[in-house]
Amino acid sequence: MATPLFHADLTVHTQSHDYPIVITENAIAENSSMASQVAPYITGRQVLIVTNETVAPLYLKALQEELEAQFTVQVCVLPDGEQYKNQSSINQIYDVLMAVHFNRDVTLIALGGGVIGDMTGFAAASFMRGVNFIQIPTTLLSQVDSSVGGKTGINHPQGKNMIGAFWQPQMVLADMSTLKTLPARELSAGLAEVIKYALIMDAEFLTWLEHNLPAMMALDLAVLGEAVKRCCQYKADVVAQDERESGVRALLNFGHTFGHVIETHEGYGSWLHGEAVAAGMVQAAELSQKIGWLTSDEVACVKRILSLANLPITPPPIEVQTALDLMGHDKKVKHGQIRLILLKSLGEAVLTNDFDPHLLTDVLATHAP
């Protein structure tokens, strides 16, 4: 008896509009019903698919041919990598839109991972002051996190995601089958964001992950699908409460302030985003222990589960002052003070600046050259 394909439907509620998250299998395969799932969310007759040089050979043809039966379809294929998440790539998207005289009736489709999703969303938010877009995330990281919630943007040489907009998609279609073509390193990077949700919101989920990580890393799509569904539901609930990150949504950035320091310092693309977040979560846990919130056993638990996912648990050597300067560019800085997401306990996070700055310096010094 054949194993039934995984399928789940969720809804994200936002001030601008509600939209579905469809988590499924084999949606982008040739002769699939993908177009029937996406087409209802395409307004107008114009479609621009934005993808990259890695994803295009795998999935572009099937998607493009299906949509061409109903729409005028153009394609923009960008280089692959975090180092290309910049204004030059955004201009390439604009150039295609302008060259074919697409207008406000266009729908952009992001076919790729977090970088493609962030850039396509930002292009959609800014082209003609805003057009629709759809997310088709093809990496675990983008399926569980970046494709949901409307954060879009690009990097600046002095800081990650410094330029962007909140712009919600019309739908998110997460095809679990795309994870079969994901390199092991990219899968692990996505697991960092999955583990993040457990650490900040749900200690029971952390226990579930410890038990199920081997199956996830062996590409058991049913188990991966359950993890993606849980993470998307967590994020949808948070976005419904705080769409523009003025409060509780900031907790989703656990590990990211430290992680962005790593990415910016080492050069975009040197460390994958999930790898940097993993090391950053350990640093945040270490600071939480110094404050007196976590025990040494709990910090060891954080390190253990990240190691199980083949993720780094120590950052590269960075001078303390350099790290502090980079943290000063963080979007959570308020009135000149660095605010961090820390753990009160496993499964409970808080955004705070109520800590001795010397404790932060101590954590950074542990890994300084």
Swiss-Prot record:
Pfam families: DHQ_synthase, DHQS_C. GO terms for biological process: amino acid biosynthetic process; aromatic amino acid family biosynthetic process; chorismate biosynthetic process. It catalyses: 7-phospho-2-dehydro-3-deoxy-D-arabino-heptonate = 3-dehydroquinate + phosphate. Keywords: Amino-acid biosynthesis, Aromatic amino acid biosynthesis, Cobalt, Cytoplasm, Lyase, Metal-binding, NAD, Nucleotide-binding, Zinc. The keyword Cytoplasm applies. The keyword NAD applies. It is found in: Cytoplasm. NAD(+) binds at residues 80-85, 114-118, 138-139, 151, 160, 178-181. Binds 1 divalent metal cation per subunit. Can use either Co(2+) or Zn(2+). SUPFAM superfamilies: Dehydroquinate synthase-like. Its cofactor is Co(2+); Zn(2+); NAD(+). InterPro entries: Dehydroquinate_synthase, DHQ_synth_AroB, DHQ_synth_fam, DHQS/DOIS_N, DHQS_C. GO terms for molecular function: 3-dehydroquinate synthase activity; metal ion binding; nucleotide binding. Pathway: Metabolic intermediate biosynthesis; chorismate biosynthesis; chorismate from D-erythrose 4-phosphate and phosphoenolpyruvate: step 2/7. Zn(2+) binds at residues 193, 256, 273. Catalyzes the conversion of 3-deoxy-D-arabino-heptulosonate 7-phosphate (DAHP) to dehydroquinate (DHQ). HAMAP family: DHQ_synthase. This is 3-dehydroquinate synthase. It comes from Psychrobacter cryohalolentis (strain ATCC BAA-1226 / DSM 17306 / VKM B-2378 / K5).
